[in-house]
A protein has these predicted regions:
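A contiguous, surface-oriented mixed alpha/beta subdomain in the mid-to-C-terminal portion of proteins
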Residues: 122-251
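The feature captures two recurrent sequence modes
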Residues: 1-143, 225, 237-295
Length: 295
């Protein structure tokens, strides 16, 4: 079998430029090197140790249910057998970042795209784009949770619809994904815990999001989140807290079309702002924030 391409962002004098791909590929598991498996083991062991008292219990339970371990990079085929029985989801291999509409269509059909290649050893602490570890360890476990699995499918269907409405609707929806799927927190009887994939796959942000005084931690509100800018190059200025995964299901039940119309008239909210109407878990000090770069 020919090894699929490794499609990575391109570094320019203006930063990283995204490079998109569209095809589905078979996971070339037999081509992973010993170094690839060591990189997986390093990342897996580090995050497992960090997340014991930081991640949502549903996430930790799902990692165990999927039989993920440091021993080797998991095989998509073995994970699919477990996921399809649990929630009807399956993984599809991809070479890199997908265009929005292609990505939405996969989610709408309970397929989660996973980048087949893993970062290099020198990228263990940071990589500009999603790799196998981010996708597989960060995103896949919660697809075993029925509520979160339903939310992801509903999000995909909403994305397909928003693609036909216009760029403003897509931006609103992108912010929802960013502040829930990628960087969401959940309130538990033991305190705030992490469920967002961008956090659970990151050593630094796993600590920062819960323990630093700098960021805001604000109760989840759908339209507030859809108006809020975010950061792609640093840790977040604000994190939004759900009370349970049912909050996400309730958020996606209504037709978003009138919401998009309302939000056209509402100004975007800077990433670090706290509003008088916010339910504030913690008002951040703003230490170390950049005044530029919100998107």
């Amino acid at each position: 079998m020919e090894t699929p391409r490794r499609v990575e962002h391109q570094q320019t004098d203006r930063g990283y430029v995204p490079v998109y791909t569209t095809g589905i590929v078979e996971q070339p598991w037999d081509t992973y090197t010993a170094e690839d498996h060591r990189t997986w083991a390093t990342l897996f062991e580090r995050q497992q140790a960090l997340l014991v008292e930081r991640a949502a219990p549903e996430f930790m339970a799902a990692v165990a249910d999927l039989r993920m371990s440091a021993a080797q990079i998991p095989k998509f085929s073995e994970l699919n057998a477990l996921m399809e029985r649990a929630t009807g989801w399956r993984l599809v291999g991809v070479e890199g970042l997908l265009p929005e509409l292609v990505f939405f269509d996969h989610l709408a059909n309970r397929r989660f795209p996973v980048t087949w290649w893993i970062r290099r050893p020198e990228q263990v602490d940071y990589i500009a784009e999603p790799d196998l570890f981010h996708d597989l360890f960060g995103h896949v476990p919660l697809l075993m949770n029925p509520l979160f699995a339903d939310y992801m499918q509903a999000y995909g269907k909403g994305g397909v619809k928003a693609s036909g409405i216009g760029p403003e609707a897509l931006m609103n929806l992108t912010r929802l994904y960013w502040y829930t799927v990628e960087f969401g927190l959940i309130s538990t009887p033991k305190g705030l815990r992490i469920y967002g994939s961008g956090i659970v796959s990151s050593k630094g942000e796993s600590i920062y999001c819960l323990e630093s005084a700098a960021p805001n931690r604000i109760g989840f509100d759908l339209e507030r989140v859809m108006r809020t800018k975010y950061r792609i190059d640093t840790f977040q200025k604000s994190y939004f807290v759900i009370d349970g995964f049912q909050d996400l299901i309730r958020a996606t039940e209504p037709d978003f079309t009138p919401i998009y119309e309302r939000l056209k008239e509402a100004a975007a909210i800077p990433a670090g702002d706290v509003l008088p109407s916010d339910r504030v878990f913690h008002r951040g000090t703003g230490e170390g924030w950049s005044n530029e770069g919100d998107v």
